[in-house]
Amino acid sequence: MTIALFPGSFDPITNGHIETAKKAAEIFEKVYLVAMTNTSKHYLFSPGERADFARDALKDVANIEVLEKPDEITVDLAHELNAKAIVRGVRNSADFRYEQEIAGINKRLAPDINTILLFSSPENSFVASSMIKELAKFDKDVSQFLPEKAAKALRRKLGNEYAE
């Protein structure tokens, strides 16, 4: 079975993340989407909440399993899950350069794990969780960029007037 790991912060998960996960599910027999922690980021949602939003959005994709592993190194987790590839989404050239650097480090740490880059569609090429959170803080409707459960939770968390 070909297994891939799709790690990320997913704070919150966006339609771009969902697109990448679904593309990976078409390529690999099993995809683990894992809510992880980047020590250089500050989170609005807990790993459990982030994983829950992903589970809800991807519940109809049989070969995707969502996990939360906030305290692991990506390549160690890939080995633990028997993944042969790490999947990453790329929106633009800045993402590409960043992912290229991370892929190089990961290859040094785990020569048996490959990084697969999947490019976003034009409609998701500008969507970033940090940007969406910023818009939501200013009471902008961000529901077009997020799965429904994540959008509602973001509105509630920030106390937006249009929260349901």
Curated annotation (Swiss-Prot):
Binding site for ATP: 9-10, 17, 89-91, 99, 124-130
One CC-aspect GO term: cytoplasm
EC numbers on record: 2.7.7.3
UniProt keyword annotations, A-Z: ATP-binding, Coenzyme A biosynthesis, Cytoplasm, Magnesium, Nucleotide-binding, Nucleotidyltransferase, Transferase
Site (Transition state stabilizer): 17
Reactions mediated catalytically: (R)-4'-phosphopantetheine + ATP + H(+) = 3'-dephospho-CoA + diphosphate
SUPFAM superfamilies in the record: Nucleotidylyl transferase
The keyword Kinase belongs to this UniProt entry's keyword annotation: no
Protein name, entry field: Phosphopantetheine adenylyltransferase
Lineage: Bacteria, Bacillati, Bacillota, Bacilli, Lactobacillales
Record gene name: coaD
